[in-house]
């Protein structure tokens, strides 16, 4: 594998949130304590108000990805280069423009959700 795995959610209730950029799923408290393993440039562990800006409780489905480089599902979902962990299949909200600008400054790609 190579890279360190992301934290696995400690509960599966209403406190789950998904990162709007990479779709990593963790609890609010986990995002507050350690941020997003795939999106460290957001620095949400330092700015707790930013958690609400870059994550959402509204998402569809969860997949556990253990070996991203070999997973066909990870390639299909375009999460094959992210840390092993739990990911949502889809988010319906877009990342706010200010956060999209941070992605551009960090030279990382942001793909908005598809309109269904």
Swiss-Prot record:
Keyword Metal-binding: yes
Cell compartment(s), UniProt: Nucleus
A GO term from the CC aspect: nucleus
Entry keyword set: Activator, Metal-binding, Nucleus, Repressor, Transcription, Transcription regulation, Zinc, Zinc-finger
Record GO biological process: regulation of DNA-templated transcription; transcription elongation-coupled chromatin remodeling
Annotated Pfam families: Spt4
GO terms assigned for molecular function: zinc ion binding
Top-rank lineage group of the source organism: Eukaryota
InterPro entries with a match to the protein in the record: RPABC4/Spt4, Spt4, Spt4/RpoE2_Znf, Spt4_sf
Transmembrane segment boundaries: none
Zn finger region (C4-type): 19-39
Major localisation: nucleus
Function: May regulate transcription elongation by RNA polymerase II. May enhance transcriptional pausing at sites proximal to the promoter, which may in turn facilitate the assembly of an elongation competent RNA polymerase II complex.
Family: Belongs to the SPT4 family.
This protein's name: Transcription elongation factor SPT4 homolog 1
């Amino acid at each position: 594998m190579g890279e360190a795995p992301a934290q696995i959610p400690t509960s599966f209730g209403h406190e789950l949130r998904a990162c709007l950029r990479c779709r990593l799923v963790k609890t609010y408290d986990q995002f507050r304590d350690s941020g997003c393993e795939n999106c460290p440039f957001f620095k949400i562990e330092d700015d707790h108000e930013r958690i609400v800006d870059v994550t959402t409780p509204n998402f569809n489905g969860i997949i556990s990805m253990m070996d991203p480089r070999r997973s066909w599902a990870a390639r299909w979902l375009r999460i094959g280069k992210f840390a092993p962990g739990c990911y949502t299949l889809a988010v319906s909200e877009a990342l706010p423009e200010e956060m999209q600008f941070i992605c551009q400054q960090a030279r990382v790609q942001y793909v908005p959700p598809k309109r269904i």
